[in-house]
């Protein structure tokens, strides 16, 4: 193995080493601090290595893994926001094994974003899923165990569908690497449909979304952030790679993505309208955002890769900020609990409101530019029905986001926020800064995305 290949695999190695050390420390230490430091070090080193590799020519690694801009962006993204999730996972008081599982989720996401082969695709997805099952259950409350059990059962079904789909594709094409997936027979079409169903579950697309609101409500907020940010981004990048490298049957693949995306936008936004619990509202909201991303993926418009990566970059700090603020208010704060929060905790109130503003896609916050990318892709592809659904979804989203956006600044009462840690404060400031930076200077993120995509 050459030095270039070792350098290309070094971020994955950092994540794996951090996870293993955290696992070894968990049973022999009295607190989770040592394991948390080990996992955080692995995540930080992986993110730093990917930043240092910016502009370095890709190294040929083999059929299983691809060292290109998509993989590098996805690895840095997973490491950075995995580290963010680890910061406020402590709020829930979860087990000492949790930091190792966070690093494993990031490792699975990094593997998935660079997957060029069915084996790597399966490995990445299952590493994410199995780690999330344990993380969802760790508080050992009724809601957490229910969320974990639902995710376990449905994840098993999705994995079965995915494996059967890959087997049928292999029977038709005789290949497991993505470039070899070329065919037009019925087995290929059925295999593609099953593969899409398996990916749709991991992506929280309707009708495979049922686990998402329960996970956001019952699981630790850090675990919800991993499922809603890191896992979602990895699956989106894997679909981008399938779009570009595999020749999946059309219009089955794009029409399936478009249909699932449209259904997710409508289901997620409509069900979020009636929610009074902040985490559950965010759970339905993330289903809608999965739908928006699926619409971009299905459009096939010029600049699809740029639009998806930009949307993911905007979406991550917004959802992370809202989930962190929610965790600091208690296990499942309601709308009424937010009343008057700005007088007690101005940082939490501001970060929560700005995060919701970005998720709604309103001006000033970065989400506004992300919505412009969405509408541009749908107009360029002349997907007028999808455009109408996206606009209706955005209007519905504005209504329920604005309810939670205004609550901290009006009224009295509410709950007494839990004591906060300095790292929580730093995370909120970091996410707030990213949201405002990408809102006022979106070229910063656009430049980073285009630099990543230039590495082929």
From Swiss-Prot:
It comes from the Bacteria. GO terms for molecular function: NADH dehydrogenase (ubiquinone) activity; NADH:ubiquinone reductase (non-electrogenic) activity; quinone binding. The keyword Cell inner membrane applies. It is an enzyme of class 7 (translocase). Signal peptide: none annotated. It is a multi-pass membrane protein. Its main location: membrane. Keywords: Cell inner membrane, Cell membrane, Membrane, NAD, Quinone, Translocase, Transmembrane, Transmembrane helix, Transport, Ubiquinone. Pfam families: Proton_antipo_M (PF00361). It is found in: Cell inner membrane. It catalyses: a quinone + NADH + 5 H(+)(in) = a quinol + NAD(+) + 4 H(+)(out). Coiled coil: none annotated. GO terms for cellular component: plasma membrane. GO terms for biological process: ATP synthesis coupled electron transport. Its EC number is 7.1.1.-. The chain crosses the membrane at residues 6-26, 45-65, 75-95, 97-117, 118-138, 151-171, 181-201, 220-240, 252-272, 281-301, 308-328, 355-375, 382-402, 426-446. PANTHER family: NADH DEHYDROGENASE. NDH-1 shuttles electrons from NADH, via FMN and iron-sulfur (Fe-S) centers, to quinones in the respiratory chain. The immediate electron acceptor for the enzyme in this species is believed to be ubiquinone. Couples the redox reaction to proton translocation (for every two electrons transferred, four hydrogen ions are translocated across the cytoplasmic membrane), and thus conserves the redox energy in a proton gradient. NDH-1 is composed of 14 different subunits. Subunits NuoA, H, J, K, L, M, N constitute the membrane sector of the complex. Belongs to the complex I subunit 2 family. HAMAP family: NDH1_NuoN_1. This is NADH-quinone oxidoreductase subunit N. The lineage of its organism: Bacteria, Pseudomonadati, Pseudomonadota, Alphaproteobacteria, Hyphomicrobiales. The gene is nuoN.
């Amino acid at each position: 193995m050459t030095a270039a290949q070792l350098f290309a695999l070094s971020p994955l190695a950092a994540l794996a080493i951090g996870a293993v050390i955290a696992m070894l420390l968990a049973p022999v230490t009295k607190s989770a601090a040592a394991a948390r430091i080990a996992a955080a070090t692995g995540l930080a080193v992986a993110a730093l290595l990917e930043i240092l590799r910016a502009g370095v020519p890709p190294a040929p690694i083999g059929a299983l893994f691809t060292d290109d801009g998509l993989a590098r962006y996805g690895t840095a993204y997973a490491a950075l926001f995995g580290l963010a999730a680890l910061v406020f996972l402590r709020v829930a008081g979860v087990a000492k094994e949790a930091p190792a599982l966070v690093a494993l989720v990031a490792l699975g996401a990094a593997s998935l974003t660079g997957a060029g082969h069915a084996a790597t695709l399966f490995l990445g997805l299952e590493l994410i899923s199995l780690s999330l099952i344990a993380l969802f259950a760790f508080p050992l409350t009724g809601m957490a165990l229910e969320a974990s059990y639902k995710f376990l059962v449905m994840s098993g079904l999705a994995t079965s569908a995915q494996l059967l789909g890959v087997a049928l594709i292999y029977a038709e094409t005789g290949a497991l690497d993505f470039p070899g997936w070329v065919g037009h027979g019925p087995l290929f079409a059925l295999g593609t449909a099953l593969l899409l169903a398996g990916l749709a579950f991991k992506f929280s697309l309707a009708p495979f979304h049922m686990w998402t609101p329960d996970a956001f409500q019952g699981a630790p907020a850090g675990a919800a952030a991993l499922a809603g940010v890191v896992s979602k981004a990895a699956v989106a990048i894997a679909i981008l790679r399938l779009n570009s490298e595999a020749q999946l049957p059309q219009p089955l693949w794009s029409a399936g993505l478009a249909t699932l995306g449209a259904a997710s936008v409508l289901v997620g936004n409509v069900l979020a309208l009636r929610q009074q619990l902040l985490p559950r509202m965010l759970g339905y909201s993330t289903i809608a955002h999965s739908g928006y991303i699926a619409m971009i993926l299905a459009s096939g418009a010029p600049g699809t890769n740029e639009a998806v990566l930009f949307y993911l970059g905007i979406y991550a700090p917004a959802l992370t900020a809202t989930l962190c603020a929610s965790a600091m208010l208690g296990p499942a704060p309601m709308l009424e609990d937010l009343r008057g929060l700005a007088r007690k905790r101005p940082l939490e109130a501001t970060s929560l409101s700005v995060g919701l503003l970005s998720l709604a896609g309103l001006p000033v916050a970065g989400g506004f530019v992300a919505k412009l990318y969405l509408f541009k892709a749908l107009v360029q592809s002349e997907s007028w029905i999808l455009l109408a659904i996206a606009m209706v979804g955005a209007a519905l989203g504005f209504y329920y986001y604005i309810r939670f956006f205004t609550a901290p600044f009006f009224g009295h009462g509410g709950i007494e926020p839990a004591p906060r840690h300095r790292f929580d404060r730093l995370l909120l400031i970091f996410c707030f800064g990213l949201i405002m930076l990408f809102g006022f200077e979106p070229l910063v993120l656009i430049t980073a995305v285009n630099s990543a995509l230039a590495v082929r």
